[in-house]
Amino acid sequence: MNNKINNIKITQVKSAIGHKYDQRLTLIGLGLNKMNKSVILENTNSIKGMVNKVKHLLKIENM
């Protein structure tokens, strides 16, 4: 049994300027508020949904 939790590294590569307000709030919810900032998060369904909403602003890597 593999107990390793899958993590993903998310990097903001585009600005949220000019995008909808709820997309900016989603970035803040992911812990991203500046360009080229990266966070490592657990790969859960809620995180996947948030990432899917703003995927055009992000670079996503599996860890």
Curated annotation (Swiss-Prot):
GO terms for biological process: translation. One of its GO terms (molecular function) is structural constituent of ribosome. Disulfide bonds: none annotated. Keywords: Ribonucleoprotein, Ribosomal protein. InterPro entries: Ribo_uL30_ferredoxin-like_sf, Ribosomal_uL30_bac-type, Ribosomal_uL30_ferredoxin-like. The keyword Ribosomal protein applies. Gene3D superfamilies: Ribosomal protein L30, ferredoxin-like fold domain (3.30.1390.20). CDD domains: Ribosomal_L30. One of its GO terms (cellular component) is cytosolic large ribosomal subunit. It comes from the Bacteria. It holds the Pfam family Ribosomal_L30. Belongs to the universal ribosomal protein uL30 family. NCBIfam families: rpmD_bact (TIGR01308). Part of the 50S ribosomal subunit. This is Large ribosomal subunit protein uL30.
